[in-house]
Amino acid sequence: MKTQRDGPSLGRWSLVLLLLGLTMPLAVIARVLSYQEAVLRAVDVLNQRSSDANLYRLLNLDPRPTMDGDPDTPKPVSFTVKETVCPRTIQRSPEECDFKEDGLVKWCVGTVTLNQAKDSFDISCDKDKRKVAQLGDVLQKAGEKIVRGLKNIGQRIKDFFGKLTPRTES
């Protein structure tokens, strides 16, 4: 009686399983991170290198720019982080920490690679200057509206007095 073990199919399956076993570690090593995962890793690196007392957590991730498909090419990133209530000395994920009320907000820009094996980050952070720039824009627009409003009021006053006719005594 002939069994499955005697046939060539067992040898083929063994070869397929062997090839799969050899290629699986390569797939794990060459794992490609998503844009958000790469930024979260960058935040972890920032927390490790920071001399501030508390951890920072991702507050806002600016929209992903259009990028090429090469995970080894550095990708531009822009995001804000905010100080949390968790001390940097404890081993805790920043996502587990609440934001500190009136905590420091930093705007970060730089590049990351999506290839986890490369793990390349070039990020610099400053106090959130965009808020100051946004305030400047708001003040400029408000000033322009005030000037337009004053011009309109001036024109109305001019029109009002222009319509008045001098009174003559009879």
Swiss-Prot record:
Cited Gene3D superfamilies: 3.10.450.10
Xref: InterPro entries: Cathelicidin-like, Cathelicidin_CS, Cathlecidin_C, Cystatin_sf
Keywords assigned: Antibiotic, Antimicrobial, Cleavage on pair of basic residues, Disulfide bond, Immunity, Innate immunity, Secreted, Signal
Modifications after synthesis and translation: Proteolytically cleaved by proteinase PRTN3 into antibacterial peptide LL-37. Proteolytically cleaved by cathepsin CTSG and neutrophil elastase ELANE. After secretion onto the skin surface, the CAMP gene product is processed by a serine protease-dependent mechanism into multiple novel antimicrobial peptides distinct from and shorter than cathelicidin LL-37. These peptides show enhanced antimicrobial action, acquiring the ability to kill skin pathogens such as S.aureus, E.coli and C.albicans. These peptides have lost the ability to stimulate CXCL8/IL8 release from keratinocytes. The peptides act synergistically, killing bacteria at lower concentrations when present together, and maintain activity at increased salt condition.
Annotated stretches, region: Active core: 150-162
Disulphides: 86-97, 108-125
GO annotation terms (biological process): antimicrobial humoral immune response mediated by antimicrobial peptide; defense response to Gram-negative bacterium; defense response to Gram-positive bacterium; innate immune response; neutrophil activation
Family statement: Belongs to the cathelicidin family.
Written domain comment of the UniProt record: The cathelin-like domain (CLD), which is the propeptide part, does not seem to exhibit auto-inhibitory function, as it does not inhibit the antibacterial activity of antibacterial peptide LL-37.
Known role: Antimicrobial protein that is an integral component of the innate immune system. Binds to bacterial lipopolysaccharides (LPS). Acts via neutrophil N-formyl peptide receptors to enhance the release of CXCL2. Postsecretory processing generates multiple cathelicidin antimicrobial peptides with various lengths which act as a topical antimicrobial defense in sweat on skin. The unprocessed precursor form, cathelicidin antimicrobial peptide, inhibits the growth of Gram-negative E.coli and E.aerogenes with efficiencies comparable to that of the mature peptide LL-37 (in vitro).
Protein's recorded name: Cathelicidin antimicrobial peptide
Species of provenance: Ateles fusciceps robustus
